[in-house]
C-alpha cells in the first residue's frame, strides 16, 4: 500500500514493495481535481504497473471528502502491467472492480531476469562535461491550457465547468441556500453564472433559485 502523492515522487514506496514480492499494489489517494490532471494520473498508474510488472489499484476520494477549496472527483483506476483494466467516470458513484491475473504477473516476473537481480544500490561515475550554448528547438505553446483541436477543447471546457460546478454543488447542499450572482458583463461573471446553472442542474434544483443582478460599469457596452 502507498498513499496518494507517494506515486508522484521520484522513488515511490511501491518500488520497494514490488521488489519485496508484492504483485498487487494499492494507492489510497485524495487527489484533488485540476484541468488535465486525470490524463497525467492515468499515465502514472499505467506506467507504474508496467514498470513493476504488477497490478496497481488507484482509489481516490470522491465528493464525500471533507473540503473547503478543493474538488475531488473519485477517479478510480485498476491497471495490470501497463493495461487499464477498469476506470471509473469522474464525479460518478458506484463500485469499480476487475479481475487481476496474479499468476500471469508472477510468470512475467520470472521471465524478466533483471527484475529478480535488480540491485537497489547505485554507482557514481565522475566525468567532465563542456557546457555549450544550445539553440532551443522545442515548440512552446503560447496557450498551453487551450487545446487546438476543437473536440479536445470542448472536452477541456466541459471539464473546467464540471470541476467548478461540483465544488459549488457541495456548498449548496451544505447550506441549502439560493444563489445570487453579480453580472458585470465580463467573462468572469458570465462563467460564474454558467457554473451556478450547472451546479443547480447537478443538485436537481429549479433555476428560480438563482438571482442574477446586473452590475454595469465603465466598461459596459451594448455588446456586453
Residue ranges and their predicted role:
Residues 14-16, 40, 89-91, 112, ...:
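Composition- and surface-driven signal marking solvent-exposed, interaction-prone regions
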Residues 25-28, 141-146, 173, 177, ...:
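Short acidic (Asp/Glu) and glycine-rich catalytic loops that position anionic groups and cofactors
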Residues 2-4, 27-29, 57-59, 79-81, ...:
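Generic beta-strand/beta-sheet core signal
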Residues 6, 129, 152-224:
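ATP-dependent adenylation/nucleotidyltransferase module used to activate substrates
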Residues 8-96:
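CN hydrolase (nitrilase-like) catalytic-core segments centered on the catalytic cysteine
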Residues 1, 5, 95-172:
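Flexible inter-domain linker/hinge segments
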Residues 11, 86, 106, 191-193, ...:
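Hydrophobic positions within alpha-helical membrane elements
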